[in-house]
Amino acid sequence: LANSRKLKEQVLMSQNQICGTIRLGSSLNIAHYRLPRILKAYTDKYPLVDVQITTGQSKHLFQLLNRDEISIAIIRGQYAWDEACKLISSEPMCLVCSLENQGRPLTDYPYIGRHTDSDLSARINRWLAAHDLAQICPHMWIDSIDACKEMVRYGLGWCILPRICLDDFDGYTEDLYMED
């Protein structure tokens, strides 16, 4: 089967048609909020390309890239990489709360923590410490960005979320400046 696929790819390439396989690893947020639209346009333009997608946390995707299990990785953060690397976007993290809680001191209502990778957790913890909020214990720990947004939307607390997920959020958002 692999030889048959390679032969077909060679024939198509000899006819100047773009084909083959691309093994793409994408961070969860990019895969959820941006990749479907991009992937649709790509596969419409290059229907002979077999696109294989793996999603996960950036650290895991970087390991897959190092083991040649994926060809390209769209990841958050900086990793020691000797080959081609390109910054494709940059986005802030945001403090989010419901409109009813806007302007209220953050110490007066619950902080909603979100499970994320260790690098981002460390950045969030540094921001909390720099703003005298390190002593705050999350009242909830949530795995899902969408669940965090809903908790915040209903006024159950405030959270720190990436801008990428906030297009449909109708509450208060404030860009945060964090060490990178």
Each predicted region: which residue ranges?
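Alpha-helical "hinge/linker" immediately C-terminal to small N-terminal DNA-binding modules
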Residues: 1-16
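Acidic, Gly/Pro-rich loop/turn segments at junctions of secondary structure
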Residues: 56-109, 164-167
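Short beta-strand-to-loop elements that line the ligand-binding cleft
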Residues: 50-56, 134-144
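Beta-alpha-beta core module
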Residues: 82-87, 91, 150-180
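Central regulatory/effector-binding core of bacterial HTH transcription factors
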Residues: 19-80
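Secondary-structure junction motif
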Residues: 110-134
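Immediate post-signal peptide segment of exported/extracytoplasmic ligand-binding proteins
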Residues: 15-22, 107-108
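Short secondary-structure boundary/capping segments
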Residues: 14-15, 43, 84-87, 102-104, ...
